[in-house]
Amino acid sequence: MPLCKTYYVNAETGRDSFDGLSEATAFASLRAVNRLTLQPGDRVRLACGSVFAGQYLHLTCCGSKDAPIVVGAYGDGPAPRIDADGQGIWYQDYGCPLDSPTHVYRGYVSSAVLLYDAAYVTVQGLEITNHSGAILGESYSQPDKMERTGVAVVAKDKGTCRGITLRDLAIHDVNGNVYDKHMNNGGIYMTALSPADEAATGPARFADVLVEGCYLYRVSRWGLAVGYTYAHAHFQGA
């Protein structure tokens, strides 16, 4: 069984050319973390006081029930801050039209943190924002405004995604699209998308999800939403 690793990231003193395996050889950016292939039991620790401006954390890794992957903080000072600033763009597609022709079901989304087909992953003790400031011509209620999320959690091609924990996160100033209610907009948003091969993987869904101690404010459209599923037709009238 491989040994678990702890990776350190310090925006002020780190370098992405380092190995990230000690505080003295910390990475500098989340780009280095996104390139890792994290294994069960691995840890990613962001230095307190670090601000990761224009960066994002997108993970597709799976821990295990006995050895989750944990992303958190280390050191003294303010919580590490991920400020996506409209970056971290990915494509959301339910794989089928939704229950109303006016509901947008696919398009590009900006997420500061994205857990995509991840399992047994804990994210804790971070500050997260995703506000692009004053974009020329963009208003609060603009219909084609960018879809933005603080934390997006997606199930698609791994069957049941288990063991996601979001703990003690301060998520704020996420100015998403207030019209596209089934897209990943707001503080925390979870969705199940149509699998490429449902016969092989089973339905896309979640189990054993825990959200605790999180503080969300100035987020739109939603604060916390377990949003929608490609299998909505099975639940009509429920």
Where do the protein language model's features map onto the residues?
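Right-handed parallel beta-helix
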Residues: 68, 72-77, 119-130, 159-175, ...
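Activation segment
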Residues: 18, 34, 55-56, 132, ...
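The right-handed parallel beta-helix/beta-solenoid scaffold, focusing on the short coil/turn
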Residues: 5, 42, 55, 67-69, ...
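Beta-strand repeat scaffolds of extracellular/surface proteins
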Residues: 12, 47-49, 62, 73-76, ...
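Acidic Gly/Asp/Thr-rich repetitive segments characteristic of extracellular carbohydrate-active
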Residues: 9-47, 52-53
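Extracellular beta-strand/beta-solenoid scaffold signature
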Residues: 56-59, 89-114, 137-157, 179-206, ...
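Right-handed parallel beta-helix/beta-spiral solenoid domain characteristic of secreted/periplasmic
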Residues: 62-144, 168, 173-179
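Mature N-terminal, pre-catalytic/accessory segment of carbohydrate-active enzymes
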Residues: 1-2
